[in-house]
Amino acid sequence: MRPRGFVIAARGSSDHAALYAKYLFGRRNRALVALAAPSLFTRYGSPPRLDGQCVIGISQSGASPDVIAVIEEAVRQGAMTVAITNDPDSRLASVAELVVPLHAGPERSVPASKTYTASILALALISQAIDRDDAFGDALASLPSRMGGALGAEADLEELVPVLCGPRAIVLGRGFNFSTAEEVALKLTETSYVLARAWSVADFEHGPIAVVERDFPVLLVGAGGSVQADLESIASRLVDYGCRVIGLFDAPNAPPGLDAAAVHDSALPEELTPLTLAILGQLLAYRVAVARGVDPDQPRALRKITRTW
């Protein structure tokens, strides 16, 4: 039976994958997606009604107690449940009705990298399974070569590094790549100790833009498509303010006036460009961490499995 909508529980990088699903399922499947507030299920003990919903838990380890709690409650309420995890033997997988194993292999770094892109791909495959489309299916089949091709822009990342080596930065995206902006900001923060904050371009203009000043570092992440005009508009405005504006783009070209940009045109539909851009964002965060003298695989104060309730 087709669910009325989706509720997705996740934390950290997995939460950004859930944000991606909000746009993907909304556009391709015309489904309403809600991101769960796990504390309603744990600390407050007042879970919302989940009847008619497909409840998805995303956790690379499958051991996040709050994500598990959401799925357990969904099972109690009789909702359809799905676990997306890199450990098919995990507690999360054992609780859910359906399991989508990522098969990404061991992830040795503390920050999520390949499990993040694998989670995005899993969500895209679920979307395709619900509403099949030949063109989207062909694009999915081409992903290995398209993602490999994105590495051709890796050398261009070096020009972006000096702009991001300060103590703070803003990362902007919109639409499908708002989730990518969130993920890149997290990677810069946790691997490089740069206090990076992500915003949707639209939300940024509703107040946060007041923080910018001359030489303020701003990273734009985008793929053209339906939001191209928004990216070009904010880029022009920030350049006029004297900000140091750089970009990661899966598109034929970058907006004019940027200090530097890494550009790769995968020719993928906009819905799938978060996969190529996530890879470039991870490599950028790695280079910034090395430039700042930080081990990006073992950031201080972090654990591979974070247990929150």
Describe these PLM feature segments:
Residues 1-3, 98-217, 227, 292-309:
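Active-site phosphate/pyrophosphate-binding segments
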Residues 216-224, 277-278:
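Hydrophobic membrane-spanning alpha-helices of multi-pass integral membrane proteins
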